[in-house]
């Protein structure tokens, strides 16, 4: 009974986090795009930069709360989700530290390096999870693995564009900013779909467990 109550609280918490995550994606995407187009010179946008950065932590929380819904080895999954969560936390810290990406400096290089490493960790962990998911699920559920990988690839591309910006800024600012904006929007859309899939799978799993538990109780009675 206690375990069931804990699961119910966990699902309620997940529902709240998913809603907040969607709001952050909705509000944070235009902030992220505008902040890049204004070269980080707008003070209001700089203050609001924490909103898109918070999305990383929310996604980590969603991944962590969803981990039990996946039909894989518990130890294997725990390691994958631990890596994913760590990567998003590192990304969050990197993003909230004020960094002028328009200048080539030691701080910029360190920020880009850390951002890149955390992106690779998240990318590898997601592939490991996705492979297990694709093996297990059939039909439309195959999409989940592809969506997760596509989302991370696009997100890493955003980071790369940000990284090469100081180098090519003088050559073709417009193209770099356009590519970054497009990647940000696409990445947001893909992450929104990922969150939706994760949320749906968790709800379906919990409903199935509840249904099985009810049937077993009925049979016992």
Locate each region found by the language model:
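Transmembrane alpha-helical segments of multi-pass membrane proteins
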Residues: 75-91, 144-157
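Alpha-helical transmembrane segments of polytopic membrane proteins
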Residues: 45-57, 110-123, 176-188
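C-terminal transmembrane-bundle signature of multipass membrane proteins
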Residues: 152-221
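Cytosolic juxtamembrane helix at the C-terminal end of the final transmembrane segment
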Residues: 3-11, 63-77, 126-144, 191-215
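Alpha-helical transmembrane segments
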Residues: 14-29, 86
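Juxtamembrane "helix-exit" motif on the non-cytosolic side of transmembrane helices
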Residues: 30-40, 93-105, 160-172
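Alpha-helical membrane segments in multi-pass integral membrane proteins
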Residues: 116-131, 139-164, 186-190
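Membrane-proximal helix-loop-helix units in multi-pass membrane proteins
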Residues: 89-140
């Amino acid at each position: 009974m206690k375990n069931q109550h804990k699961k119910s609280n966990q699902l309620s918490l997940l529902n709240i986090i998913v809603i907040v995550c969607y709001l952050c994606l909705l509000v944070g995407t235009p902030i992220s795009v505008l902040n890049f187009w204004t070269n980080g010179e707008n003070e209001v946008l700089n203050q609001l930069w924490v909103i898109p950065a918070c999305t990383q932590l929310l996604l980590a929380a969603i991944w962590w709360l969803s981990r039990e819904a996946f039909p894989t080895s518990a130890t294997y999954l725990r390691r994958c989700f631990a890596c994913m969560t760590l990567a998003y936390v590192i990304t969050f810290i990197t993003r909230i530290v004020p960094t002028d990406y328009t200048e080539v400096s030691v701080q910029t290089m360190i920020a880009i390096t850390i951002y890149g490493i955390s992106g690779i960790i998240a990318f590898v962990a997601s592939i490991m999870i996705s492979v297990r998911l694709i093996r297990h699920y059939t039909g439309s559920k195959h999409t989940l693995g592809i969506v997760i990988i596509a989302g991370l690839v696009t997100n890493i591309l955003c980071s790369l564009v940000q990284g090469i910006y100081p180098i090519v800024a003088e050559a073709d600012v417009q193209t770099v900013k356009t590519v970054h904006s497009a990647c940000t929007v696409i990445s947001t859309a893909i992450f929104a779909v990922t969150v939706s899939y994760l949320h749906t799978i968790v709800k379906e799993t919990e409903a199935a467990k509840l249904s099985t538990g009810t049937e077993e109780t009925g049979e016992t009675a």
